[in-house]
Amino acid sequence: MKILMTSASIPMVMDLAVELNSMYHLRLTDKTAMSTGMEFVRSDLGHGTETNELVSGMDAIIHSGYANPSDSESVQLDYQMRCTYNLLWAAWEERVTRVVYLSSLKQMDRYDEDMAVTERWRPMPRSDARSLCYHMGEYVCREFARELKVKIVCLRLGDITQNGSEPESVSSLYVDDAIDAVVNALTYDATGWDIFHIQSEVPNERYLTGQPWCSSGELSVSLGYKPRPRSSA
């Protein structure tokens, strides 16, 4: 399977890419030129033939909603709205049928911790650029999927934590669990627009995982993700 991964300069994306590189043929991209040791194509994800050439021949795209904090807020939001739209449009034109959008559980953390928050709950993003970027990126993806242009699986990830480290929060997500979720999303029998909450098994874990997703009034199967047992849990 040939997979394009965006935002290669983001450490979380590179952590995933290093592991996925042994399973798939990866092409990485970012607006900043960089050396990765893997196939890399610099791209601004503009509305032109360059983005079509970038996605041409890919079987799937893993697109990150994480915004570079060194960019201005307007640049961060522009990337998640305009550039995400450009990427999905090119994917549709080039007949890429699968996109995995990496979002965040941060959109859900305004709910009280004693609530059993699932994927059916409405996101409540904060007013900061990082939270709004995830929210607006999801919005663009959802509208594309609703028009049946591309099948999109949205993974709301917990706080990325290196394997073997102490959990950073009650919604921590270890890298190996994140890899498992992404691999499942790449082969999941997507309905068009599917959302799944992903976190690891940690003490007092906050979010439910492994839930089925309700799309167009019908209950679909779960992603099949199960967090790995942790000795510290």
What do these predicted regions represent?
Residues 1-22:
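N-terminal Rossmann NAD(P)H-binding glycine-rich loop of SDR-like oxidoreductase domains
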Residues 35, 42-81:
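NAD(P)H-binding glycine-rich loop region in Rossmannoid oxidoreductase-like domains
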Residues 46, 75-86, 94, 128, ...:
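Glycine-rich NAD(P)-binding loop of the Rossmann-fold in SDR/ketoreductase-type enzymes
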Residues 86-127:
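Conserved Rossmann-fold NAD(P)-dependent oxidoreductase catalytic core, especially the SDR/UDP-sugar
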Residues 107, 129, 147-169:
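Flexible, glycine-rich beta-alpha linker
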Residues 112-152:
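Catalytic helix-loop patch of NAD(P)-dependent Rossmann-fold dehydrogenases
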Residues 146, 157-162, 172-196, 201:
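Alpha-helical substrate-binding/gating segment
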Residues 195-232:
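Conserved C-terminal active-site "lid" loop/helix of NAD(P)H-dependent oxidoreductases
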